[in-house]
Amino acid sequence: MSKEPDRLFAQPLPQVPDFAFNEDVVRVFPDMIKRSVPGYPAIVENLGVLAAQFAQPDTVLYDLGCSLGAVTQALRRHVRSDGCEVIAIDNSTAMVERCREYLNAQNSMFQELLPVQVIEGDILALAFKPASVVALNFTLQFVAPEQRLALLGRIRGALVPGGALILSEKLRFNDEQEHALLTDLHIAFKRANGYSDLEIAQKRSAIENVMKPDSLEEHRQRLLAAGFSKVVPWFQCLNFASLIALP
């Protein structure tokens, strides 16, 4: 993947636009997410490991909001179930084009990988096939809050017995002191990764109108309301977490 450093918010902007997954973001996305999301590499690689435990023969593995395909690549590295395929979908043209390039490169380096389709489209309009693994890796937080339950219900309806949804999200906290502490620690993480206070502030202004995090309890209750039987947190680093939801 590209090693271009993220300097998108390094200079003062007269007006900070809403964050969008456009060509500028795609160009620096690997650097951006690694320096912004604590534990991201561990989540992605272990998502592949977890998926291998839930994948069922002759089913689909979905990567919803696939961005550059890091999760898709992890699924293909770890899952060996017969007859499975990966369907990766994103609504950003720039992301989809670059994702296809990266997956073609993966094809040239490895043999016996799962077949994959990369689709440009809206996950809210997706016609789900029978699935054993669905990954929502930092995607649900960009879906309008009033549309989240319906999406999760459709995912639950597509999951076969023994399958799982793996949901990774930034969290907010209902306790003000806890929320303030973990927010400050996240800022410290970004500073330690080379972001200036200006970059942090401008990125926050850009993203706060388009990303709406939920609390862990809100996720749990929504997943249960969508028909999942069990919700198990398996990873948390600061205010970022990943959950396994079982049908």
UniProtKB/Swiss-Prot annotation:
Q: Which residues bind S-adenosyl-L-methionine?
A: 40, 65-67, 90-91, 122-123, 137, 204
Please tell me whether the keyword S-adenosyl-L-methionine is annotated for this protein. yes
Q: Is-annotated flag, keyword Transferase? A: yes
Q: Which reaction does it catalyse?
A: prephenate + S-adenosyl-L-methionine = carboxy-S-adenosyl-L-methionine + 3-phenylpyruvate + H2O
Which superkingdom does the taxonomy of this entry point to? Bacteria
Keywords, comma-separated and alphabetical:
S-adenosyl-L-methionine, Transferase
Q: What class of enzyme is it?
A: transferase
Mind listing the GO molecular function terms for this protein? carboxyl- or carbamoyltransferase activity; S-adenosyl-L-methionine binding
Q: Which InterPro entries match?
A: CmoA, Methyltransf_25, SAM-dependent_MTases_sf
Subunit description: Homodimer.
**Similarity comment:** Belongs to the class I-like SAM-binding methyltransferase superfamily. Cx-SAM synthase family.
Functional summary from the UniProt entry: Catalyzes the conversion of S-adenosyl-L-methionine (SAM) to carboxy-S-adenosyl-L-methionine (Cx-SAM).
**Protein name listed in UniProt:** Carboxy-S-adenosyl-L-methionine synthase
Give the originating organism: Pseudomonas syringae pv. tomato (strain ATCC BAA-871 / DC3000)
- Give the gene name: cmoA
